[in-house]
Design a protein with these regions (language model features):
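Conserved P-loop NTPase
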Residues: 19-28, 32, 88-91, 97-133
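Substrate-engagement module of ASCE P-loop NTPases
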Residues: 47-68, 72, 88-99
Length: 133
């Protein structure tokens, strides 16, 4: 297995890389920084997030590729930007915690294929992030 990283925020370039590399997984960090230069709006705007999210959804379905989209959250804990992004995806996960505490919680807010009544508790230690049993 090989891993490729690209530093790119243009959706057309990202799609081109996907078509050339044929990956099994795409991770976008973050959707609010991706831009379609054909649109007259800023990265992170509702128009950009909707269009770029839709383009990622299309390529994932066409090529049977899993896509993980990282997004920003507001201080209140809701997903920043247009709510419709949540409706486009199958699963919404929140990773919660802060530097003052060693534990982090992975909480499911939406799961089209299963329960949202489970959480994962992780601990940050000298080995990195570890599942806490």
């Amino acid at each position: 297995m090989s891993v490729s990283f690209i530093r790119c925020n243009n959706i057309d370039d990202i799609i081109s890389h996907v078509n050339r590399l044929s990956p099994n997984l795409i991770i976008i960090d973050s959707i609010q920084t991706i831009v379609n230069t054909d649109l007259d709006s800023l990265p992170g705007s509702p128009t950009q997030v909707r269009d770029c999210g839709q383009r990622l959804l299309e390529i994932s379905k066409q090529r049977n590729i899993s896509v993980i989209i990282v997004g920003h959250v507001t201080k209140e804990g809701s997903i920043a930007g247009p709510k419709m992004l949540e409706h486009m995806v199958d699963t919404v996960l929140h990773f919660e915690g802060d530097k003052q505490h060693q534990f982090r919680i992975l909480r499911s807010k939406k799961n089209r294929f299963g329960s949202t009544n489970e959480i994962g508790i992780y601990q940050m230690n000298e080995k990195g992030l570890q599942l806490s049993l």
